[in-house]
Amino acid sequence: MESTHNVLGTIQESLAQASRRAAAADRPYVTLSYAQSIDGSIACRPGRPLALSCREAMVFTHTLRSIHDGILVGIGTILADNPLLTVRHVSGKSPRPIVVDGRIRFPADAQALQHHRKMPWIATAEEPDTERERALVKAGVKVLHIPFDRDGLIDLTLLLMQLRELKIRSLMVEGGAQIITSFLKHRLVDQLVLTMAPVYIGGMQAVWPLQLNPFNPPRLENMSWEMCGSDLVMRADITWREP
């Protein structure tokens, strides 16, 4: 693993290369980015938010947001953390907030709706034109109707294809655990940006069982890392092998 003090520069170059190939791509370039403890925990338990990143790592993360077209989270993150999903701490444009919400549980008072210059897009498998959908559309939300996959979750492959049609060329995926796991399970991640806080939590893991071939797992390549305050930030390309 290469030690470097320009992880952000490497990420920007990866996005630039993806942008040059964007015309032929059928989905956005996906950056999976999240913070965890040294033992892989992202929360003490489900539904309970946990602040892990130091200020320097937060600045890094918000800079990362500013260079992506979209930012995606699951409805569990909205309900547990009520995040803004904006760029703060640094100058730059905020990405389009995209929420995977199979049954439209998105609350009308969510900060991502009330305090974001760009209205969120919600991907759901709910029947169209429900009362809840009409209320969100009236508030400015764009609803994307995506069917469930065979696991009973939003079909992420179809979602990404639709996002690409909507001019989302780069997508930052932040979580939570079910979203992280689903993107990895379906081989939809291009690069990983992992922030590790120097603490043990012993809580909910970021990645659940992937049901991949243990003898031919995906590999991290072109790895680089740097310290952001007290946190370690690691960046790598993900190489997917045959199942």
Regions found by a protein language model. Give the residues of each.
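Enzymes that bind and transform nitrogen-containing heteroaromatic metabolites
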Residues: M1-P243
